[in-house]
Design a protein with these regions (language model features):
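Short helix-capping segments at alpha-helix termini
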Residues: 151-153, 245-249, 294-296, 325-331
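Catalytic pocket-lining loop regions of alpha/beta-barrel enzymes
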Residues: 210-294, 298-301
Length: 392
């Protein structure tokens, strides 16, 4: 469904154009049997330039070949994702995905593409919350129902808990939220404090950030950092300075939403360096592939940050696909889309590889507090088989 809508246009154009091209190069409107089985532009069109049936423009053989190549490359869908040999386990983790804002179709597509686990960071919901009760309900959802919902589609769900910087500027509310955080930091499936850090880099954000660094130390949890959209370089440097001022070990901290301006210093200072595939505002997968080629895979992580806005829950699999197409080593791909996320977010033992290598059966007959993910459909009951040799 997701892939189909994305890839339908090039395929449709190719099919329509191909039929039209045959009409311009053959007396009959029906393509010959040989044409139907042609394996190249030269075989199909005899090496001639042809007229486009849509606009009347001219296509050279090389242009036609590119159209065919692009259409073939884009013809993947969630049920037929081409295999990428990895030299290791062929599975992916999306370590930053706001799944409460996504649909069950997204879970199905992610599972089909090889995603075995997601981490959902606590963040804001698109509008400011006004009382602590809304945070309590939200924290209960990402530590409860959302874990159940993901499991109904064969994906393990984990989360991070924290007071996000965007809403931290409400002083009274922030104090109330900070007071309730400890009750959730020991919940099953909580792998870090996050996402925390700076948004507008105000004194109030700084106060809330520092308080949560101390909570992470108290509960012996890693930290997931949100870096600001504006003045990112200064904000990222300030974030690392404050963490180090509090004596927090960089090896236990993921700095997320990096770009070309921040990557070197983040890695040089010993932090885990995560990249969010948001082409317009954060990081495009072409740019990410170039950075992996430049800096390598050590402590580098890829995520989608898919949420309620325009975003892509398949950003991690698509980026893996692109890196493979660019000739990046299979083990390097495996490290940035799977191994590194497991290493840092598995530190407290809540996230373990055995959770998906030895999975519980998917049984959509089960309920969560009386609620089902189904709406009249036949329940699926089976065990998800994880493919340990390819990324799908």
């Amino acid at each position: 469904m997701i892939f189909e809508s994305f890839f339908q246009a090039p395929q449709g154009f190719l099919k329509g154009a191909e039929a039209g091209f045959h009409m311009t190069t053959h007396p009959s409107s029906k393509a010959s049997e040989a044409d139907a089985h042609a394996s190249s532009v030269e075989e199909m069109f005899g090496g001639k330039s042809v007229s486009c049936p849509c606009c009347g423009g001219t296509f050279t053989p090389s242009m036609l070949q590119k159209i065919m190549d692009d259409a073939e490359r884009l013809s993947l869908n969630q049920k037929d994702f081409r295999a990428i040999r990895t030299g290791g386990l062929g599975m992916m983790i999306d370590p930053h995905a706001h799944m409460t804002a996504r649909t069950t179709d997204d879970y199905e597509a992610m599972a089909a593409a090889g995603v075995v686990a997601v981490i959902e960071p606590a963040f804001w919901l698109g509008q400011m919350r006004t009382n602590v009760g809304t945070f309590i309900d939200y924290f209960s959802t990402i530590t409860g129902f959302e874990r159940f919902r993901a499991g109904q589609f064969g994906i393990r769900h984990y989360c991070t808990i924290g007071m996000n910087p965007k809403e931290a500027n409400n002083v009274a509310l922030a104090e109330e939220v900070l007071a309730v955080l400890p009750r959730y930091l020991t919940k099953e499936g909580v792998v870090a404090v996050g996402e925390i850090g700076y948004d507008e880099q105000t004194p109030q954000e700084d106060k809330v950030f520092r308080a949560q660094i101390e909570l992470a130390k108290e509960f012996d949890l890693p930290i997931m950092i949100h870096t600001p959209h504006r003045d990112k370089t200064r904000g990222t440097q300030r974030t690392m300075d404050v963490l180090e001022e509090h004596g927090f070990d960089p090896a236990r901290c993921v700095i997320d939403h990096n770009n070309e301006e921040t990557v070197r210093e983040v890695l040089d200072r010993g932090y885990w360096c995560a990249f969010t595939i948001y082409p317009s505002t954060k990081m495009g997968n072409e740019r990410l592939a170039a950075l992996v080629q430049q800096y390598g895979s050590e402590r580098v992580i890829v995520d989608s940050s898919c949420d309620w806005g325009v975003s892509d829950p398949l950003a991690v699999p698509k980026t893996a696909r692109l890196m493979a197409d660019k000739g990046i080593a299979a083990d390097t791909i495996h490290q940035v889309v799977y191994k590194n996320a497991l290493a840092i977010y598995g530190l407290n033992g809540e996230m373990q590889e055995s959770h998906w290598l030895q999975p519980q059966a998917i049984d959509q007959r089960t309920l969560y507090e009386g609620n089902s993910v189904l709406r009249g459909q036949e329940p699926k009951v089976h065990t998800r088989t994880v493919d340990a040799t390819v990324i799908r």
